[in-house]
Each structure stands twice: as C-alpha cells, then as structure tokens.
Amino acid sequence: MDQTTRTVQAQKHIALVAHDHCKTSLMQWVAIHKEKLQHHILYATGTTGHLVQRATGLPVTAMMSGPMGGDQQVGALISEGRIDLLIFFWDPLNAVPHDPDVKALLRLATVWNIPVATNRTTADFIIHSPLFDRQVEIEIPDYQLYLQQRLK
C-alpha cells in the first residue's frame, strides 16, 4: 500500500489499556510519569481509565470497558488518526474472552504505525525517548489513494 505522512504533535494523544492482572502495574507506571503525562491527552478503556484517573488525578477520557467494546473504540480512534501512542499492558499468560479484540487493536496500531508499549520497560523507553515531547512525522497508509484505486 502507498504511504503518506501524518504529523504527530508534541502534545500526544495516548491510549492506556491494561488487562486485569496488569492494571496495578499500569497505574504505578502512570503515577511515576505523572509529571510528564499531564502535558498530554489521555484516553483509556473503561475500568482502566477510571482507576488511573482516581489514582493519579489526571484527566482521562474513558471508553467502554475492553470486553464491552472499549478495545474496539480505541482501535477506531487509532484508525481515525486520533491516537498517537498506545500503552497496553497485556497479560500474555491469561486468555481473555475478548482476545480477538486485543489482536485487532494491536493490528490497527501496527497498520497505522503508532508506537506500542506492551510492558513497563518498553513504556519507559518510549516516554524517555527524545521524540516523546516533540512534533514528528510518521508514515501511514494513504487511505485516500487506496479508496480511489478501489473505486475505479
């Protein structure tokens, strides 16, 4: 597929997602990085968003709970170019009923070329990157060209 570029602003739109066994770890990570994260716009799946907001006081736009469609809501935001970064602490040792949604969410993050952290170490590398607080250009699929070609 042909590519185009999208400008990711210095103020990032960050999605926070965590499986049940990882919610405490994500809340701790957000608390540690609260000073840096407060300058960005946070989104999260339902339960995670409410827990993060209560634990840190940071404003979080909460979607529905993951199993109730929240993963798909975050995926839609990624597809629309409204999420710049996904922090998703997932539990690879426990299956969840909405595993297909999890796979779809990770797939969309890859398709739309946004950074994804699936554990604390990767999240630390991302938040400490010199690009984290800067405007950057990323390559994304050229959906308009794709659509034009499909409609010929």
From Swiss-Prot:
The species is: Erwinia tasmaniensis (strain DSM 17950 / CFBP 7177 / CIP 109463 / NCPPB 4357 / Et1/99)
- Its family? Belongs to the methylglyoxal synthase family.
Q: Which HAMAP family match?
A: Methylglyoxal_synth
Q: Which UniProt keywords apply?
A: Lyase
Please list the residues that make up the active site: D71
What does the entry list under GO cellular component? cytosol
Protein known as: Methylglyoxal synthase
* EC numbers, comma separated: 4.2.3.3
- Gene3D superfamilies reported for this sequence: Methylglyoxal synthase-like domain (3.40.50.1380)
* GO biological process terms, semicolon-separated: methylglyoxal biosynthetic process
Q: What is the lineage of its organism?
A: Bacteria, Pseudomonadati, Pseudomonadota, Gammaproteobacteria, Enterobacterales
